[in-house]
Structures are given as structure tokens and as C-alpha cells.
């Protein structure tokens, strides 16, 4: 989200604000060029701009110990709420989305296929429920990795 679909605003006489988060098309391991793994900082490219992500302001923020300490504190404050909300949202919407997902996959024949910039591992998920399980596992693994690496 720090390369695209992320905005910073500056209200008059106020601090910088992040948001709104725009979309999640590149989130949760869905784009191989942004590093589909849960165990890395996908927003940090090579400092010589040779990577797809390139040099961004986030590269520099993550080298600032004060920023990392504040980020760690904030993560610890919101982690469980965020993870539970994400997993709860998936569970809540899954029954409602299943009919549309089945129709979508029938029309577009995209199950078991890595489309566009998706990682090749998407070929392993041959049902909608497989993809839901992938998403849930990714979220849990990502949260655990952040716990250990922030």
C-alpha cells in the first residue's frame, strides 16, 4: 500500500495524515512484483532504485529508530483488533460472496491460474474456498512475522 493506493494529506494547521486506504488489489500476496511473501517488507526496494519498488520515502522511514519504535508500539496496540477484524470480515462476507465468486470463476475461468501480476503459486488454489484459506493463512502468517520483525 505504500507504493500505490496510499495517500497522505495535510489539513490546514494540522499534522500529516495517512489515508484513506484506497484499495487492496496489490495486498495480501496478490502481486508477485510487490513481493507476495508474508515474510519481508515489500515496501522496501533496493536503495539504488534497481528493484521494481525502487527508492521510496518508506525506505528511509524504516531506517529511523524513532519511527520504528513508534510503529512497533502502534502495531502492538492495534494488532489483535486488526487481525481479528480482517479474519472476521472474511468469515462474514464469505457466504454472501460465494455465489458471485462461483459465477465469476465460471465465466472467466480463472481458478488455478496466475493472472496478470499474481504469483505463480495462485495456480495451486483451484477453488474459491482454497483462495479464502490462502488469504486467512497469509494474514495470520504476516501478523506473526511483523510481531517478530518490527
Regions found by a protein language model. Name each.
Residues 1-150:
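Middle-to-C-terminal accessory/interaction subdomains
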Amino acid at each position: 500500500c505504500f507504493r500505490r493506493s496510499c495517500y497522505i494529506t495535510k489539513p490546514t494547521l494540522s499534522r500529516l495524515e495517512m489515508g484513506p486506504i484506497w484499495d487492496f488489489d496489490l495486498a495480501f500476496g496478490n502481486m508477485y512484483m510487490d513481493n507476495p511473501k508474508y515474510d519481508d517488507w515489500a515496501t522496501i526496494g533496493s536503495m539504488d532504485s534497481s528493484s521494481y519498488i525502487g527508492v521510496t520515502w518508506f525506505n528511509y522511514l524504516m531506517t529511523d529508530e524513532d519511527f520504528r519504535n513508534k510503529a512497533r508500539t502502534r502495531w502492538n496496540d492495534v494488532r489483535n483488533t486488526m487481525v481479528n477484524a480482517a479474519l472476521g470480515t472474511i468469515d462474514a462476507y464469505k457466504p454472501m460472496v460465494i455465489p458471485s465468486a462461483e459465477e465469476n470463476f465460471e465465466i472467466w475461468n480463472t481458478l488455478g491460474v496466475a493472472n496478470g501480476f499474481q504469483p505463480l503459486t495462485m495456480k495451486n488454489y483451484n477453488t474459491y474456498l482454497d483462495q479464502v484459506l490462502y488469504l486467512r493463512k497469509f494474514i495470520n502468517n504476516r501478523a506473526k512475522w511483523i510481531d517478530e520483525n518490527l
